[in-house]
UniProtKB/Swiss-Prot annotation:
Protein name, per record: Histidine ammonia-lyase
The entry's keywords: Cytoplasm, Histidine metabolism, Lyase
Family designation: Belongs to the PAL/histidase family.
Taxonomic path: Bacteria, Pseudomonadati, Pseudomonadota, Alphaproteobacteria, Hyphomicrobiales
Covalent cross-link 5-imidazolinone (Ala-Gly), where: 142-144
Molecular function in Gene Ontology: histidine ammonia-lyase activity
Chief localization: cytoplasm
GO cellular component: cytoplasm
Amino acid sequence: MTIILKPGSVPLETLEKIYREGLPVRIDPAFHAGIEKAAARIAEIAAGDAPVYGINTGFGKLASIRIAAGDVATLQRNLILSHCCGVGEPLSENIVRLIMALKLVSLGRGASGVRLEVITLIEAMLEKGVIPMIPEKGSVGASGDLAPLAHMTAAMIGEGEAFYRGERLSGAKALGKAGLKPVVLAAKEGLALINGTQTSTALALAGLFRAHRAVRTALITGALSTDAAMGSDAPFHEEIHQLRGHKGQIDAGRALRTLLEGSAIRRSHLEGDQRVQDPYCIRCQPQVDGACLDILRQAARTLEIEANAVTDNPLVLSDGRAVSGGNFHAEPVAFAADQIALAVCEIGAISQRRIALLVDPSLSFGLPAFLARKPGLNSGLMIAEVTSAALMSENNQMAHPASVDSTPTSANQEDHVSMACHGARRLLQMTANLNAIIGIEALTGALGVELRKPLTTSAELAKVIAALRAKVAALEEDRYMADDLKAAAELVADGTLSGVISAGILPDLET
């Protein structure tokens, strides 16, 4: 299945499909005429006498140097090779595929001036599985993601490296094995390919998709913990949240209320329970997870706009002029990444407190210490809780806003930058930590519910426990725990736990 992209109106759901499923993409042919028109205009400018940045001039601080017409192709090739300065491990294939798809969307709007053959090469590389090797580090998020996108473009011109069928090869060999030929870049094409926010945006989108799946699963594990602790569902009453009015809070409260519906555990303590109120980690779940959901939705709106944006420079305007601007500055992406990081921290923080509550016999309303069936002889989930605390603290340290940092580059020509790329990249590690925390809560919550037998939980939560138990057996006595934690985290990350919940219960991003 090939996804047909309509530049300027590609929805988040399509971008998530590209990220998660690695499907090939193509630009809607209806956009080809506009692409060719802008390319023809760039060719006219290149043949003329007027200096235009990036077409017949140097780059950055060297913009005042005029380039002869005969050197225009060499200029573009030199630009790519000189900007291949990335360091670190290669970005994963699904991230690079998303980067390439976003670049197609940007170029496809017909304001960049690249020829159609550049577009079709990117499409063919995605279809045949030629994935450029892009190092993870080296971008400051303005003037675009220069180094990462230079590595992408290097493979297109037969330089650099690329992966093909799991093998890391030179760019030329990877193209050759796939039956493709490198492109010779014309005027401005190298600049159009490397000048843009596609790397930062792809990383931020990946973080968003992972965080959204995590918060949906955290609502499930939070409901499990509520039932395991014999907590009250009264704080999830719809009118409470309507009186405050925040959409995320309303949606989170409704989800928690529905997930707990029909629980025999809950019915067992409706009368005669001497506790007046539950701790905040139980009672305030709608307020905390709902606020996180709202901030993820705000970031989603920003990133959907950015994914459809034209972010190179100069741009070919509708009147045919090539005008320099600053759309390559990734400040909106940096802000969105910082917002996502804050949400990831808080989802994990309140989840960790519920884990701590369930393993503490002074708080868990009758559950054994550390959920061990024979406390003392067995330590149960004692150190799993410690691990969740370590992961929470690590995420807190990584949440420092990247967007507040800036440093001048390129001889002060590029004197304020966004730091969006590493601000977005850290979300991959943060969401991996979050998945592990929520996975641990799934283990504690499920075991806590099982220890309440013969009382049973709700039908929805019973499905979650069954999905968990298909991969992780209930803890009867101490055993090697690392595999359990890994399996539980994977069930969060791959959507297994959230996938068993009936449609319409868990909240969407709703951009």
